[in-house]
A protein has these predicted regions:
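Short Lys/Arg-enriched alpha/beta "domain-start" segment
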Residues: 15-23
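Aromatic-lined carbohydrate-binding surfaces of glycoside hydrolases
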Residues: 38-43, 48, 52-64, 68, ...
Length: 293
């Protein structure tokens, strides 16, 4: 007699796996007491929390929604919170409290933006993947789904400026040092405390690949940079007819640190934009949302 046993257990979705991995990172000793279930998608993000057989079951339309549900449970039933600092522990009760009734919530807004250019110039230039991993967990727990993602863009620019004829020395001198890159990226300042080491460019490129991959795992659409007109002054050597203007001094810095802008009506502008977006997409993919300043 041949007996075939069929399991009713379905394979976890990628969103469910992402959530299980999150709890294993944050409080591994409790991971088996949580279950996650991705359910049908509707027009709005939503989550549902309920007790089920001694475990906390969290349902939602995607990982981001389930993460928000987890955060609600932690805040209101465990009376704890998760910080974005990687070395902070999450203080959990000895016994997980079970919700007495089902909780259902729906997101009030579709797009939830986070971060700004300056944020990337405080301690972030020195962050490792572990620091970013914790911040992305925190972002998911708080429902962020449109994070600014500008790490590693200098590696893209290095490729673009090289393709347009600038030398390695010209390109790396054009960038500021790591702590001042936000103000370089905002077109305020060039050259200050440069050049950037090529090794640093490569490290940040690898880090950005990890960042955007994890953000997308939690249903986020990273906002990547685009070209706004800021160019190295040395570009004039290769394109002497280009309409490049020197900007006024900024923040009390000497004239030699002033930035330069290409006229958006100059045909070279579209060429640079196309090259940048193509190179960036090769490295980091795209969700077709960009920020330029």
């Amino acid at each position: 007699m041949l007996i075939v046993l069929c399991s009713s257990c379905k394979e976890s979705t990628e969103d469910e796996k992402a959530m299980q991995q999150m709890v294993e990172r944050l409080f591994p000793e409790y991971a088996s007491q949580f279950s996650f279930e991705q359910s049908e998608k509707i027009d709005k993000d939503w989550y549902e929390i309920e007790a089920q057989g001694g475990t906390v079951r969290i349902r939602g339309n995607n990982a981001n929604s389930m993460a928000v549900g987890l955060n609600y449970y932690l805040n209101h039933y465990c009376l704890t919170s998760v910080s974005w600092y990687v070395n902070d522990t999450v203080e959990m009760p000895e016994v997980l409290p079970m919700p007495p009734a089902k909780i259902i919530s729906t997101a009030r807004c579709k797009n939830r933006f986070f971060l700004n250019y300056c944020t990337f110039g405080y301690t972030m230039p020195w962050w490792t993947w572990k620091d970013w991993e914790r911040l992305i967990d925190w972002m998911a727990l708080n429902g962020i789904n449109m994070p600014l993602a500008i790490t590693g863009q200098e590696s893209v620019w290095y490729r673009v400026w090289t393709k347009l004829g600038l030398t390695d020395e010209e390109i790396r001198n054009y960038f500021t040092g790591p702590a001042h890159l936000p103000w370089h990226r905002m077109s305020n300042l060039d050259y200050w405390q440069g050049p950037l080491p090529k090794e640093w460019l490569d490290t940040q490129e690898a880090l950005q690949k990890q960042i955007v991959a994890r953000e997308r795992q939690f249903n986020m659409r990273p906002i990547l940079p685009a070209f706004a007109g800021h160019v190295p002054s040395e570009l004039k050597r290769i394109y002497p007819e280009a309409k490049i203007s020197r900007m006024s001094s900024w923040g009390g810095f000497e004239d030699k640190y002033r930035s330069h802008f290409l006229d958006p009506l100059d045909p070279l502008f579209a060429t640079i934009q196309k090259e940048f977006l193509e190179e960036q997409t090769k490295l980091f993919g795209t969700d077709h949302i960009y920020g330029a300043i």
